[in-house]
């Protein structure tokens, strides 16, 4: 399984896509790169409310204080959006996640303008859930 790119490479790769069909395919590919989430983690405690598709996100803090995120979705494009969010929050502490404004990255990628309203709402629900969990850890 190929590793996920860092933030800058994500943005570069995204801007290299010729059109939105290519960008959607790239997002789906990123979702396919996510490590498999265990069956035990597919439980109501980890489900994200407010997403039309089913989304599970598991968050834990490692010994260095860095937040580790794992996730899954039953929809390919949404799983890719989970991967995008994880890339943007990669190697951050709980405090960093709470303080980090992720939306300018979405604007640079022109992502929110090209998502359906329900996917945009789901993306916001993911961000709120991650930030809320991070605030409880910090």
From Swiss-Prot:
NCBIfam families: PRK09296.1. InterPro entries: Cysteine_desulfuration_SufE, Fe-S_metab-assoc_dom. The gene is sufE. Transmembrane segments: none annotated. The keyword Cytoplasm applies. It is found in: Cytoplasm. Belongs to the SufE family. It holds the Pfam family SufE. It comes from Enterobacter sp. (strain 638). Homodimer. Interacts with SufS. GO terms for biological process: iron-sulfur cluster assembly; sulfur compound metabolic process. Keywords: Cytoplasm. It comes from the Bacteria. This is Cysteine desulfuration protein SufE. Its main location: cytoplasm.
């Amino acid at each position: 399984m190929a590793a996920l790119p860092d933030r800058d490479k994500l943005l570069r790769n995204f801007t290299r896509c010729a059109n939105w069909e290519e960008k959607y395919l790239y997002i789906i590919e990123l979702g396919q790169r996510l490590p498999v989430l265990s069956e035990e983690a597919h439980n109501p405690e980890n489900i994200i409310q407010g997403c039309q598709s089913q989304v599970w996100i598991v968050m834990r803090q490692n010994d260095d204080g860095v937040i580790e995120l794992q996730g899954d979705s039953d929809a390919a494009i949404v799983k890719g959006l989970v991967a995008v969010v994880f890339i943007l929050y990669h190697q951050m502490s709980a405090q960093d996640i709470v303080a980090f404004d992720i939306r300018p990255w979405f604007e640079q990628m022109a992502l929110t303008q090209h998502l359906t309203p329900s996917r945009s709402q789901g993306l916001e629900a993911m961000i709120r859930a991650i930030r809320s969990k991070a605030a409880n850890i910090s």
